[in-house]
Curated annotation (Swiss-Prot):
Assembly notes: Part of the 50S ribosomal subunit.
UniProt keywords, alphabetically: Ribonucleoprotein, Ribosomal protein, RNA-binding, rRNA-binding
GO CC, any one term: cytosolic large ribosomal subunit
Biological processes annotated in GO: translation
Chain spans, region Disordered: 1-54
Keyword Nucleus: no
Annotated source species: Nitrosospira multiformis (strain ATCC 25196 / NCIMB 11849 / C 71)
Compositional bias of kind Gly residues: 21-31
InterPro entries membership: Ribosomal_uL15, Ribosomal_uL15/eL18, Ribosomal_uL15/eL18_sf, Ribosomal_uL15_bac-type, Ribosomal_uL15_CS
Function: Binds to the 23S rRNA.
Name of the coding gene: rplO
Protein name: Large ribosomal subunit protein uL15
């Protein structure tokens, strides 16, 4: 088989539909658009969400809530996730690079969930009491 001899499977390619080319084609006269009406005209499509002049749904429903300007950008990291990060020293930047916390996270806390098998050194990351005990039991430290 050569690259220049590759062809699509039989029936995989359909001929382009040519509309408005006589009644013998099956798609002549109205060209598949039906008779009259807005959708049969050139440029005859309304914008998404338009309901014919009726008050649209997004305007009929009341507003709700607000976006807090002081939203907390906190994240939690499981202890078992630290086991999968290469390297011995872990800080917030390394957690972001590993994809364990979002880039917008300002505060990160390690929680006791799962096990940690190797010694890691946490820098500038708060941990729960149980997580701290587990890290130190594995030979690691928290700064």
């Amino acid at each position: 088989m050569q690259l220049n001899s590759i062809k699509p499977a039989p029936g995989a390619k359909h001929p382009k539909r040519r509309v408005g080319r006589g009644i013998g084609s099956g798609l002549g006269k109205t060209a598949g658009r039906g008779h009259k009406g807005q959708k049969s005209r050139a440029g005859g499509f309304h914008k998404v969400g338009f309901e014919g002049g009726q008050m649209p749904l997004q305007r009929r429903l009341p507003k709700r809530g607000f976006v807090s300007p002081t939203k907390k950008n906190d994240a939690e990291v499981r202890l078992s996730a630290l086991d999968r990060i290469p390297g011995d020293i872990i800080d917030i930047l390394i957690l972001k690079q590993a994809g364990l916390v979002s880039g917008s996270a300002l505060n990160v806390k390690v929680i006791l969930s799962g096990k940690i098998e190797r010694a890691v050194k946490l820098q500038g990351i708060p941990v729960t009491k149980g997580a701290k005990a587990a890290i130190e039991a594995a030979g690691g430290s928290v700064e």
